[in-house]
Amino acid sequence: DRWGRIDFLVNNAGIGSPKPLHETDDDTLDQFLGIMLRAPFRLARDVIGHMQPGSAIINVTSTFAVVGGLRGGAYSAAKGGLTALTTHIACQYGPLGIRCNAVAPGVTLTPMVAHRLEDERFRKINTEMTPHQRLGRVEDIASTVAFLCSEGGSFINGQTIVVDGGWSSTKYLSDFALNAEW
């Protein structure tokens, strides 16, 4: 009420864990779903009544919500649920002029993945399997979010925009790529 209306909501929260599904306990699953699905659901629910036509909700998901992965079942499940929520919001609130889209980053240079990037093999595989031959930067994701909130993105609704330099197009998630000697 203090600000009168909300023009844009960007749900950008995540935690990571490389655990496979069979090693993920219920507490970990609940934590992942709480941070990456339940919180964005609640935020969208609570702000949608304050949004006007032309407003937008942007959910930051992951390439692992789009192409799957060999590890991180709780992460993929939560981000996949957020992708589904994105399309639901777009369909339900699009007639009111409120858009909802998702941005699905690939491996991006953030504090969340910093420890993984210390592993030279991980860094090399992800860099070389990306046609752009580099990892994502925060600016790559931020500029996509800004575009989706702008007039230029006004006719985009219910979409997941993958921002990974082509990484998901390379079939990275094969046993060969994960076990290759670089």
Could you tell me what each predicted segment is?
Residues 44, 78, 86:
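Active-site helix of classical SDR
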Residues 21-22, 54, 67-73, 95-96, ...:
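Active-site loop immediately N-terminal to the catalytic Tyr-X3-Lys motif
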Residues 102, 121-156, 163-165:
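C-terminal helical subdomain
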Residues 67, 146, 157-182:
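Short C-terminal tail/terminal secondary-structure segment
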Residues 20-21, 28-33, 126:
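Substrate-binding pocket helix/loop in short-chain dehydrogenase/reductase
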Residues 62:
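Residue(s) in the substrate-gating loop at a strand-loop-helix junction
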Residues 49, 91-95, 154:
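Alpha-helical segment proximal to the catalytic Tyr-Lys
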